[in-house]
Amino acid sequence: MSINSNNMTDLIIAIVNDAVSDWILSYAYLLKNPIKINATHKQLNERYKFKNADNFFRSEWFKFLTDYKITYDWIANKMSICANYKYPYKAMIYFRNRIKYLLRNELL
């Protein structure tokens, strides 16, 4: 069974939806609500489902996106916007929709 372009786009979008949503919301929350310096990484993960930036940018799905020319700088910029936005969830939706647009209209 072959995968056509539309199915591949849907697969990529599903990966993006799952990975980006939780990460950006956690990242935005942490920037708005700093954690005490003595909190352990394990506590951060348990409490906020948060992965540090190094792990995030080394992740397989991130590499997959960059293979499609969605750059580190672009994603980092959108994360910064989301974190500083009054309503991070709305900003995250914009970010996710922008990736969908790129995948559907410019990349495949």
Regions found by a protein language model. Name each.
Residues N7, S21, S26-Y27, T40, ...:
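Terminal low-complexity, poorly structured segments
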Residues A39-P88:
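Acidic, low-complexity, intrinsically disordered interaction modules
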Residues K78-N105:
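Charge-dense polyanion-binding interfaces
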Residues I12-I13, P34, D67, Y72, ...:
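Low-complexity, intrinsically disordered short peptide segments enriched in small/polar/basic residues
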Residues S2-P34:
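N-terminal acidic leader/helix
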Residues M1, R104-L108:
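Short intrinsically disordered terminal tails
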